[in-house]
Amino acid sequence: MAEVIEGPLWSARNWSADEGEGSIHDDATATELGFRGGTVAGDVHMNQFPPVLLRVFGKEWFERGNLSLNFKNATIDQEKVQVFAEPRKSGEDSVKVWMEREDGLQVAVGSAAIGDHSKSELRQKDYRPCDPEDLRILNRVKPGMSLGSYNIHTRTDKQYQRYDAGLISDPLPWYRKGSPWGGSVAAPCTVMEYLWGYSMNGLAPLVGDSVGLFGAIEIGFEKGPFMMSRDYHLESRVVCVGQSPQTEYVWYETDAFDYLGDRVARLLIQSRAMKASSPAYQE
């Protein structure tokens, strides 16, 4: 039996800790909601996967691969975590991947693949929405709703600063220097910075007062990589809304197109709003 492929133990950084009161990354806010401290964001953890995925799929992963994760347990600043992937079987283009804390606690579980994205961990989920009348925080968010169209330019400054400061977990030199495709490649956190960050312009005004966190994230490439210092057009939309006993959640998706109109990258994400943090649930 082939051995599981492992990445190094890495002290993941909560680089959003300074967002202040009302953020799940703030120690006081997170502790009040039952966490051990300000949580490390999911995109920080996603940065740790590409070196392992290069060993599984080669550089083709940045061209037409995906990474699809459900987050299971939150970590706090500088807790050590490690990435694992099953070896790729002959004739198969998808593998199971996961992340564990140093003590073995599962942080995230999902899939990675090249080629067909339709059978990923997150795209196999049931996206039938709940009755919107049951929602109190996300009651203005509707399936199919546009979250906007945006023309963007991928600036290098934030990614380079994070790279130089040692904040990107297990970083690839391609994030700062040249790559097989010429310029610098976007790290997963930078894909999120644009494809999630711009969609929040459309979503945030519709969300009631609450503390949010990521429940699941998938990034995928179709005609990648997603490069720095390039122009892209983004289209974002709501997939569905629903709830669990502790949260209300929204699934939404953003596509990035190049100047030829080809889809370069995709983001599918679940954002959760904690009921315990919302005045709408204070009865």
Task: Tell what function each PLM region has.
Residues M1-N14, I76-K142, K223-E283:
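HotDog/MaoC-like acyl-thioester-processing domains
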Residues M1-R64, H117-A216, S278-E283:
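Hot-dog-fold acyl-thioester-processing enzymes
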Residues V44-P87, G91, V109, V191-V238, ...:
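Hydrophobic beta-strand-centered segment that forms part of the acyl-chain substrate-binding groove
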